[in-house]
Amino acid sequence: NPDGHPEIIFAEQQGIRHSKRDDFLNELLKRTNKKMIAVAGTHGKTTTTAMAIWALKQLQIPVSYSVGAKLSFGDMGEFDPDSEYFVYEADEYDKNFLSFSPEIAIISGIDYDHPDIYPTRESYNRAFVEFICQSNDVFAHPADLERIGMAAEDVTTVDPSLFTLVGSVNRKNAQLVVEALSTITDSSVEDLVKILNKFPGVSRRFEKISENIYSDYGHTPEKIRGALQIAQEIANKNVVVVYEGLHNTRQHFIREELDNLLEGIKKLYIVPSYLSREDESLEMLTPDKLCEIAREPVDREPAILDESLKKSITEHVNNGDLV
């Protein structure tokens, strides 16, 4: 409960104004006369936001921004008084993104998430329709627009084969960034593509931990598919997955899709889910129960984050598998 948070209590006692993030950011943009480039989507928004920040920095264009992951080329947030644009990872959780009317909106992908906020897929889609309608220029994949009952006015002419980034989802979202930035910079499409082909990535988004070991924050069906597609694209041998679900509530939502997500992997280890904001009335889906749900004919095993799992991972890596 935010009302009982000690920092809020202290601020109120000291007469210090406080607000939600979106209210604060709107006030900041208004006072500093900055235009927002908002990146929204069920999946891919962190990486896509970072791509836009990376490109503007490489072009030596002043930029202010806020992104939800650690960057190798800057802090998670930065304010430059000389910047014209504020690049923002616009999260749909708690309908946060509906507080903004961006100059440019980039939609990295629309699926379905956050059933605790959006009880139905229709309510989730309606939020994206509303966000798009209150944005000035929108760059999105036609299939995502069709999914929410909208249509694209123009189709990208940026050739996806020009990108050397790993992962088809990253190449598709790089297209959107190039299209968007080409409208507000003097750079050619060719130069923007070259810059994005050198994009170093962000933490926890198919981040290389060591040789043949990667970490990814994929926790919805499309995010998991995207991560596995990248893994299968770069793996020399087999792909092994250690799966830690995010929220027991979300596991109930994706449980029936688990078997379809695991096609082509050699071994699946399922560890206990990370718990937060849970519906206590729902059955706890333990690793054993999730292993039973995963019907795909893949070798699967319940596990915990211990030395035994570490030993198994080491054996897979030594065998040339990608984990």
Give the predicted meaning of each segment.
Residues F163-K267:
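Nucleotide phosphate-binding/pyrophosphate-handling subdomain across enzymes
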Residues A151, L258-N319:
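C-terminal helical cap/extension that packs against the catalytic core
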Residues R21, I104, N238-V240, K267, ...:
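Structural motif
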